[in-house]
Amino acid sequence: MRIDVLSLFPDMFAPMRQSIIGKAIDKGALDFQVTDFRDFTENKHNNVDDYPFGGGAGMLLTPQPIFDAMASVEKQAGGKGRVILLDPAGRQFNHEVAQELATYDHLTFVAGHYEGYDERIRELVDDEISLGDYVLTGGELGAMVIIDATVRFLPEILGNAASAEGDSFEDGLLEFPQYTRPADFRGRMVPEVLTSGNHAKIAEWRLKESLRRTYLRRPDLLEKRQLTQQERDLLDNIKSEEQ
């Protein structure tokens, strides 16, 4: 997979070359490039923004440097891939969107600043995505979040498909509590069932605790899920326990 980012602050993305994503880059599973679109300005002051026609507060990113930076990416990569604009007005990012983006071979993110974009920039764009109903000072943090969540679904990244598949939201439930050694930490005991060796009982406990955590923290997820009879029975039991 190739990921390009157009940004005015490319140094912000340096930490992304560490940890799991860094390993994927080292393995050749991910080609990660950040382009400073200020380098493509055609004015002597290297300005990338200007006042909006018709008046109004703030400054807008001008189209020329972004168009030319995109052309450079297209030349280097043999295409611009799926172009994503980070914008508060875009569709909201979530687990399913991350899975969807992971199916593409090439993604290009446009991370803006200032009041917004000249509307003509949207001609380059295939998708507009927002992290939520709030405004950040720039698109860089949003791009980082989306990239990190997306590349986890690439087979080469985690090295264990179960790591991604077992995460919260993968099956519509929050993840169950997990424990490691020691079994007794200063009087705080690991649930006995987890050390029993009874895999059927462990699976049932994990399902029940996933349901409990979802019921208590994100009941909206249960409304979207088609519960099995076993899940309904466990949920009834949880509700009586939590009263």
Swiss-Prot record:
Residues annotated for S-adenosyl-L-methionine binding in this entry: G112, L131, G132, D133, Y134, V135, L136
Entry keywords, A to Z: Cytoplasm, Methyltransferase, S-adenosyl-L-methionine, Transferase, tRNA processing
Subcellular location: Cytoplasm
Pfam families: tRNA_m1G_MT
One GO process term, biological-process aspect: tRNA N1-guanine methylation
Listed GO CC annotations: cytosol
Enzymatic reactions: guanosine(37) in tRNA + S-adenosyl-L-methionine = N(1)-methylguanosine(37) in tRNA + S-adenosyl-L-homocysteine + H(+)
SUPFAM superfamilies linked: alpha/beta knot
Similarity comment: Belongs to the RNA methyltransferase TrmD family.
Function recorded in the entry: Specifically methylates guanosine-37 in various tRNAs.
Name assigned to this protein: tRNA (guanine-N(1)-)-methyltransferase
Lineage: Bacteria, Bacillati, Bacillota, Bacilli, Lactobacillales
Gene from which the chain derives: trmD
